[in-house]
Amino acid sequence: MNIYDQLQAVEDRYEELGELLSDPDVVSDTKRFMELSREEANTRETVTAYREYKQVIQTISDAEEMIKDASGDPELEEMAKEELKESKAAKEEYEEKLKILLLPKDPNDDKNIILEIRGAAGGDEAALFAGDLLTMYQKYAETQGWRFEVMESSVNGVGGIKEVVAMVSGQSVYSKLKYESGAHRVQRVPVTESQGRVHTSTATVLVMPEVEEVEYDIDPKDLRVDIYHASGAGGQNVNKVATAVRMVHIPTGIKVEMQEERTQQKNRDKAMKIIRARVADHFAQIAQDEQDAERKSTVGTGDRSERIRTYNFPQNRVTDHRIGLTLQKLDTILSGKMDEVIDALVMYDQTKKLESLNN
């Protein structure tokens, strides 16, 4: 099937989806309605570009016809030639865009995410750097118009972050932040370093797509839920009523503790969101490991131990090791202006996928 047959098939399916989403039987089936709505949303940009492309093809045909008929009218002929030139350039641009749009879509790209950041090797300095990463993602979320909600956090004695779990909600969050999973290394002089030596520390980032209950159902028998009193600074109980929730997925041993909210039900709901995402991610990771060769052909959103980026403070430098990108803009990037890095990762991933399709 050539590219034009593929595009026509996508447009035909898009029109079929519009009809299905008006079908009362589909509307009453929540899971099917969500699946079809997501499929329609994922193909909308491709269909819009294809329809615009067909208009450009028609414009080229009309301009060529006009040139034939413009004999004796140099002004009309010149105008038609200019339109033909512009339309042919637009045609090439649309063809490149459509090739990318036809690449297999990641079904999670439009989803919200659960973001986890942990201080790793480097003690207090690693925890402080984890806090810097949290601020970077919060500010980037602001620039994108996303909602950023810290769901659970644990700090150390110097104000750094041992661990933080956040929900980031908005348009296409996963598509932009999915490349952030991995080990982030920092090189800088700690405030406690009297000799001015540069220390290296690490923080880890994990990005998981939010998983709706209708998409991934956890059997209640597979969960152990403990209720206990929330503790404040110094470990004292801060609530007379037990509101904190500890949830364990027995088959995998995955555990979530939640005590940020004032009510047990809210803590239970948040814990369920996180554990559903972690369990789904756990099994998705197993499946992804079985397709190791395929994963290595792209940017790499799978290997959680992979050192993906280095932040060098003395040189104001950020290096993404996966794509060989180096920018002397560390201060800018940590302030939340991440577009240059993320756009480069997306472009690299798309290019690699195009190459693998052509081979």
Curated annotation (Swiss-Prot):
Source domain of life: Bacteria
Keyword Membrane in record: no
Cysteine pairings via disulfide bonds: none
Listed InterPro entries: PCRF (IPR005139), Pep_chain_release_fac_I (IPR000352), Pep_chain_release_fac_I_sf (IPR045853), Prokaryotic/Mito_RF (IPR050057), RF-1 (IPR004373)
PTM summary: Methylated by PrmC. Methylation increases the termination efficiency of RF1.
A GO cellular component annotation in the UniProt record: cytoplasm
Subcellular locations according to the entry: Cytoplasm
Record-given protein name: Peptide chain release factor 1
The species this protein was found in: Streptococcus pyogenes serotype M1
Gene that this polypeptide is encoded by: prfA
